[in-house]
A protein has these predicted regions:
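Glycine-centered, small-residue-biased loops immediately flanking beta-strands
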Residues: 191, 286-287
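NAD(P)H dinucleotide-binding glycine-rich loop of Rossmann-like/cofactor-binding domains
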Residues: 61-68, 73, 102-196
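Rossmann-fold NAD(P)-binding glycine/threonine-rich loop
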Residues: 292-310, 327
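Adenosine-nucleotide cofactor-binding segment
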Residues: 192-198, 210-277
């Protein structure tokens, strides 16, 4: 099978000899991959890994799978084959994958020496997104979406509405990360928010906050291209290089709706200066959320910045099935706009060219490159497919506008009868 595979730190390469995945458990299905996004985690695995992947010569704790493995965990595709225990999905369905591998998935690998190992405390309590042995399909547990096909259990697959193109469907996983952060902080509609960092997660948080009824969103981002994109997606923007750190915080607090800081802040950058800004830009009793993945190093901040104003600081890790379902529902209802979501995609590349044409580009051109998605199955038809899908979306929008107009006319007629 063709794949862009991880062989170890600094060693990602294309192969056409990766082992073909097969159904083992009765509730598994085979997915023909259409698109799979590149995540910051994939870049860190290349430059600083292994993080979720096992060391070369070792196996993953959950699955006992070794390297090499196909990378990629932001995947969408079409069901190709179903096991005898699959109940709700059928061949031909468009699906997106929740790629977590946790204690509850051990049954899928009956030959693993850990198949009967006791579940960790978090999994026992239902918080599988913070499993002590957390791994990902495409990052350690098993091969992922930078390959032609993936096998996954049905409970990790969600049907995508027919009108959602599969390139946009590949954004559902990162959007679920953002949605989970909003759930974790118990976001209240009508509140205000500051997002620090306009990478894919920061931009996705704009979409999630809009869908959740946020009254005002400000994004702090130094890169011009990313600020422009954040504006297109409905946020006010600020360039933090315009002022020194203290002046930036004072300015951001002043432009919050109300003039005294934000109800919620979301740190999508993961730096000491952004953590402190996330806390200090809050109004009293506000909540700061960390979505960034940090290295294992210590930083300085003042606990009294939290205590004196009864602020809260919390982390958000991955997602659960609730978040995937909520994002898909928001797409169905139009609360997440497909065209706005598609702004996040700045490149489409075949997996053969994935290392130089995508991964290295994201590492070396990160200010102007946001989200690149890979395909194993489109073979040079990237631009044509994207153009066709844009036409489909425009036609869908036109039909919806016509329906709304007809409804308005009918309502007006009823009022005058």
């Amino acid at each position: 099978m063709r794949a862009l595979a991880y062989f170890g730190k600094g060693n990602i390469r294309f192969t056409d000899h990766l082992k073909e995945p097969r159904i083992v458990a009765p509730d598994e299905l085979v997915i023909d991959i259409a698109w799979c996004g590149i995540c910051g985690t994939d870049l860190h695995e290349y430059t600083d890994g292994p993080i979720f992947f096992p060391e070369d010569g070792h196996t993953h704790e959950i699955s006992h799978n070794p390297l090499p493995q196909a990378m990629g965990h932001e995947m969408a595709g079409t069901v190709l084959e179903v096991g005898p225990g699959v109940k709700h999905l059928k061949v031909g369905d468009k699906v997106v994958v929740e790629p977590t591998g946790t204690c509850r998935d051990r049954y899928r690998w009956p030959l693993s020496p850990n198949v009967d190992k006791e579940w960790c405390a978090a999994c026992k309590k239902g918080y599988y997104n913070i499993c002590s042995y957390l791994g990902l399909c495409g990052a350690g547990v098993q091969s992922g979406g930078f390959a032609e096909r993936v096998v996954m259990n049905e409970s990790h697959c969600y049907k995508v509405p027919d009108f959602v193109p599969l390139d946009v469907a590949a954004l559902i996983q990162p959007l679920a990360v953002c949605w989970h952060a909003i759930r974790v902080c118990e976001f209240k509609a009508g509140s205000t928010a500051l997002i620090i960092g306009a990478g894919p997660i920061g931009l996705g948080t704009i979409l999630a906050l809009n869908a959740a009824g946020c009254r005002d969103i400000v994004v702090s981002e130094p890169a011009k291209v990313r600020r422009e994109l954040a504006e297109k997606m409905g946020a006010r923007v600020y360039d933090p290089t315009a002022h020194a750190a203290k002046e930036s915080i004072d300015y951001l607090r002043s432009i919050a709706d109300g003039g005294d800081g934000f109800d919620y802040t979301f740190d999508c950058s993961g730096l000491e200066v952004t953590l402190n800004a996330a806390i200090q830009c809050l109004t009293f009793r506000g909540t700061a959320v960390n979505l960034a993945m940090w290295g294992h190093h210590k930083i300085q901040f003042s606990p009294m910045d939290i205590t004196l104003h009864e602020r809260k600081y919390t982390g958000s890790m991955c997602y659960t099935h609730h978040d995937f379902e909520a994002v898909i529902e928001a797409l169905e209802e139009g609360r997440i706009d497909i065209d706005r979501a598609r702004h996040m995609i700045t490149g489409r590349v075949n997996i053969e060219d994935g290392l130089d044409g995508a991964i290295m580009k994201l590492i070396n051109e990160k200010e102007s490159t946001i989200k690149i998605i890979l395909t194993p199955n489109n073979h040079g038809e990237l631009n044509r497919e994207a153009d066709n899908e844009k036409k489909e979306i425009s036609e869908l929008g036109r039909r919806k506008d016509q329906e709304r107009l007809r409804e308005s006319i009918n309502e007006a007629k009823l009022r005058h009868t």
